[in-house]
Amino acid sequence: MKRIILILTMFLVVGGLSAQEQPMKFLGISMNCTMNTFVNKLKGKGFTQEPNDNHPNTVFMKGTFAGEKVKLEIRAAAKTHLVYIVVVNFNRSTSYTYENLKTTLLDKYGDNNKEYNKLKEEDKYAKFTTDYIVWRLNEDSETHQCNRLVLSQCSYRANFPLVLSYIDGKNSIIDLQEVESDF
């Protein structure tokens, strides 16, 4: 009986260990590493490091991502130096469409079944949102244009650079705990 309980306990422990959340990856590189290790692996993929003027725990790099020239901003926790965010800044002149990029990312990473980046009707205004763009069309403004946008009867163009953020939840919590421990 003890042997059966021991075997069951071992299966539960091993199963629990294998079910732990995997760290975020960027270009196949795990973000659960130090800044120097992460930067060296990116250099191996053709990225070059840019000068950094007074931005502690941050590295800037240039390279190619999704077939486009981009600039990366990589941040790490101050004490552990673990990477917790990679921000991908596309060139302002990069020609892309929202739907093409969305399809590319969904093909690579799958759908998380959450509704993002949709037009929404609200009491006072219609709002189109991405992580970085918010358009608010008040009732007092041109309601005809607002209705056309909501009904998808017109196209729109945002003249903003595209920014993608890869955030490792575990390492960002470590960074937050380090900051809180300083106070």
Task: Cite the ranges covered by each PLM segment.
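Small/flexible residues
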Residues: I4-I5, A77, T104, N138
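Sec-dependent N-terminal signal peptides
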Residues: I4-L17
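Intrinsic structural disorder/low-complexity segments
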Residues: L6, Y84, Y156-N159
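Non-cytosolic coordination micro-motifs
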Residues: Q20-H55, F90-F183
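Accessory recognition modules or surfaces
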Residues: M24-K25, I29-M35, D53-K79
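Mid-chain, structured segments of secreted extracytoplasmic proteins
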Residues: M61-T104
